[in-house]
UniProtKB/Swiss-Prot annotation:
Similarity annotation: Belongs to the intron maturase 2 family. MatK subfamily.
Keywords associated with the record: Chloroplast, mRNA processing, Plastid, RNA-binding, tRNA processing
Protein name: Maturase K
Example GO biological process: RNA splicing
Organism annotation: Amorphophallus paeoniifolius
């Protein structure tokens, strides 16, 4: 227990002095420019995603945003004078996003500098695509999951108390004024739904309307939630262990642990609740969902569930609903992860064996990892996007009816290709073919609506080859990727293919 206390104390001692005093300096943009905030080789070279700005993040844009922040008189007047409060008026979204965006830019600077120094020590900066941690999940599913017995499907608990977010940053940041500024955002402007989404009094969920600040706060919160795993990994280093390592990126964090674990669960780090060993444990997370898979028994998974609930409750001082952790056996249940409905069913079979003149049957079982497209949630997502009704019947999309024919076909085709590309890892393609059919017929209905015709007459006039790319795009891509395949293509199309250029989940998948 003393080792755990010492580890947490040591990890939090590496605090960073924040750059808050520089917010009130006129030429902070020069400091930002010198440390890589310009467009040349910057970690922040991406769309600004600020209302009214279509440019990239640059030193000039950072200067303009920071200028808004150190106009304290303007902020005070806007709070006190409701008649002249531009935050409450039609510019509320613009100015609230500007302040939250620039705050996120500033707090990212010391963390990005730490990453740069870490990469410089290795004398070789890997390419950005090599940091995409989703690539490590696919081989884990294919190689490891079929050998495990139980899985805990975990939703990382939130909302959290606003003071918890501040305290998490306080463990690593020494600059008190910057923390006061963060409290100022939470308390004074809690009615900004685009900054943070109020759930209950003083409790907030994260909002994706401000992605920079959202990602920074969310990543800090998740790192604190998973800090115990880093401690366990270091304590178990003397045992046989293999790990894919820790990947840090601004969008998501991920860590997979494959080793023997000795778990200490304590109440507020004062007394030990239990001690147990797990012979084979895996932890995988992507975005706000994680799975904890084990080769152990169901009782062991219940201990892990109780451990997580107690850890979150004692460490973050809020009640974590046990219903957010589902324990399932692979042979009987499925679980959702990465937009797939995954399972490891047991397939019994009988093998005839013959020894001399005697023959007998040997019963055996095989386990195979399967992933399917969850058709019911996908139809719900397509229904929300107005591609079909709640029953899955395709409908026209009137919002796109005013576009040109080529634009309509391109948008439907791009949506179909993205979903087909993402769900190419499914082992059963029937649900994917149904989604393609819905999108194809929805496109035909939209074009027929535009030309004031029926779908039948429209398709007869254009021929049977119309919209054929909805079904042949994946086959064309495979023929280019694997031109020398030695077995029939129809068998290849039934196999799972994980594309490594999947760096984020499709918008429709986020509805699941």
């Amino acid at each position: 227990m003393e080792e755990l206390k010492g580890y947490l104390k040591k990890s939090r001692s590496k605090q960073q002095h924040f750059l808050y005093p520089l917010l009130f300096q006129e030429y902070i943009y020069a400091f930002a420019h010198d440390h890589g905030l310009n467009v040349n080789g910057s970690f922040f070279y991406e769309p600004a995603e600020i209302s009214g700005y279509d440019k990239k993040f640059s030193s000039l844009l950072v200067k303009r945003l920071i200028t808004r922040m150190y106009q304290q008189n303007y902020l005070i007047n806007s709070v006190n004078d409701s008649n002249q409060n531009r935050f409450v008026g039609h510019n509320k979204n613009l100015y609230s996003q500007m302040i939250s965006e620039v705050f996120a830019v500033i707090v990212e600077i010391p963390f990005s500098l730490r990453l740069v120094s870490f990469l410089a020590e290795k004398k070789e900066i890997p390419k950005s695509q090599n940091l995409r941690t989703i690539h490590s999940i696919f081989p884990f599913f294919e190689d490891k999951l079929s050998h495990l017995n139980c899985v805990s499907d975990i939703l990382i608990p939130y909302p959290v108390h606003l003071e918890i977010l501040v305290q998490i940053l306080q463990c690593r940041i020494q600059d008190v004024p910057s923390l006061h500024l963060l409290r100022f955002f939470f308390h004074e402007y809690h009615n900004w739904n685009n900054l943070i989404t109020p759930k209950k009094s003083n409790y907030y969920g994260f909002s994706k309307e401000n992605p920079r600040l959202f990602l920074f706060l969310y990543n800090s919160y998740v790192v604190e939630c998973e800090s115990i795993f880093v401690f366990l990994r270091k304590q178990s280093s003397y045992l046989r262990s293999t790990s894919s390592g820790t990947f840090l990126e601004r969008a998501h964090f991920y860590e997979k642990i494959e080793q023997h674990l000795v778990v200490l669960c304590c109440n507020d780090f004062q007394k030990t609740l239990w001690l147990f060993k797990d012979p084979f444990m895996h932890y995988v997370r992507y975005q706000g969902k994680s799975i904890l898979a084990s080769k152990g028994t169901h009782l062991l998974m219940k201990k892990w569930k109780s451990y997580f609930v107690n850890f979150w409750q004692c460490h973050f001082h809020f009640w974590s609903q046990p219903c957010r952790i589902h324990i399932n056996q692979f042979s009987k249940f499925s679980f959702y992860f990465l937009g797939y409905l995954s399972s490891v069913p047991i397939n019994p079979s009988a093998v005839k064996s013959q020894m001399l003149e005697n023959s007998f049957l040997v019963d055996t079982v095989t386990k195979k990892f399967e992933t399917i497209v969850p058709i019911i949630p996908m139809i719900g997502a397509l229904s929300k996007a107005k591609f079909c009704n709640v029953s899955g019947n395709p409908i026209s999309k009137p919002v796109w009816a005013d576009l040109s024919d080529s634009d309509i076909i391109d948008r439907f085709g791009r949506t179909c290709r993205n979903l087909s590309h993402y769900y190419s890892g499914s082992s059963k393609k029937q649900s994917l073919y149904r989604i393609k059919y819905i999108l194809r017929l929805s496109c035909a209905r939209t074009l027929a609506r535009k030309h004031k015709s029926t779908v039948r007459a429209f398709l007869q006039r254009l021929g049977s080859e119309f919209l054929e790319e909805f079904f042949t795009e994946e086959e064309k891509a495979l023929s280019l990727i694997l031109p020398r395949i030695s077995y029939p293509l129809d068998k290849l199309y039934r196999e799972r293919i994980w594309y490594l250029d999947i760096i984020r989940i499709n918008d429709l998948v986020n509805h699941l």
